[in-house]
């Protein structure tokens, strides 16, 4: 779930940044307002609504999480691209006749691979937490599928009966899974988390 949704999120965010860096001031203004509007809405509400309608298939959950979580990454990639487009090697590529598509996808984005890897890891951790939240609340997840959120949901009754260890293990696995993606995402810039 995490890797698939993160791939969709990073792909949409990169394409959004490509469109938003076109030379038209109207497009830049429109896309700035569009992303601010999307960021003002809580994505968890939309994810829960669309997941409850979808029927709980895994691919659909991955797609919904990816489609509802791209805004923060798009804002970060767009800011980095705007800075990168002012650099000397981009000016040289423009002089050599590079198209806007080539400037973004073959010149700028390859130089942002550390940032993209970091965003990929953060988005994967976010997607895992979202899927666990959906499964915990029983929204849009297949009850026959194996999920840490479903395990936590089923173990809450045991918690009230004094069996705290039933909640501990799925919660610890979920925590360690999210932590591992966070560590992987910060290791790309050489300043990883020291444990």
Model regions and ranges:
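Hydrophobic alpha-helical segments of integral membrane proteins
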Residues: 26-34, 38, 108, 148-151, ...
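Amphipathic cytosolic juxtamembrane alpha-helices at the membrane-cytosol interface
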Residues: 4, 24-27, 82-86, 91-118
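Glycine-rich helix-loop "coupling/hinge" segments at transmembrane-helix boundaries
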Residues: 51-55, 80-81, 130-174
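C-terminal transmembrane helix and the adjacent membrane-cytosol boundary/short C-terminal tail
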Residues: 58, 67-68, 114, 120-122, ...
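A short glycine-centered flexible hinge/capping loop motif at secondary-structure junctions
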Residues: 9, 13, 17, 21-24, ...
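Transmembrane alpha-helix boundary and packing residues in multipass membrane permease domains
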Residues: 18, 47-52, 61, 65, ...
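Generic hydrophobic transmembrane alpha-helix motif, especially the helices
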Residues: 11-74, 79-83
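Hydrophobic alpha-helical transmembrane segments of multipass integral membrane proteins
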Residues: 1-20, 46, 50, 105, ...
């Amino acid at each position: 779930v995490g890797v698939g949704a993160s791939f969709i999120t990073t792909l949409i965010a990169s394409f959004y940044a490509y469109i938003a860096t076109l030379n038209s001031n109207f497009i830049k203004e429109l896309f700035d307002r569009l992303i601010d509007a999307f960021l003002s809405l809580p994505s968890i509400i939309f994810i829960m609504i669309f997941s409850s309608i979808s029927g709980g298939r895994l691919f659909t959950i991955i797609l919904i999480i990816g489609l509802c979580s791209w805004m923060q990454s798009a804002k970060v990639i767009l800011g980095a691209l705007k800075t990168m487009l002012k650099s000397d090697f981009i000016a040289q590529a423009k002089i050599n006749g590079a198209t806007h598509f080539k400037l973004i996808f073959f010149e700028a984005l390859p130089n942002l691979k550390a940032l993209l890897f970091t965003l990929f890891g953060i988005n994967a951790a976010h997607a895992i937490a979202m899927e666990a939240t959906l499964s915990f609340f029983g929204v849009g997840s297949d009850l026959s599928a194996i999920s840490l959120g479903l395990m936590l949901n089923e173990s809450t009754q045991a918690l009230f009966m004094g069996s705290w260890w039933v909640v501990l293990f799925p919660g610890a696995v979920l925590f360690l899974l999210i932590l591992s993606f966070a560590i992987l995402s910060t290791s790309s810039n050489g300043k990883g988390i020291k444990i």
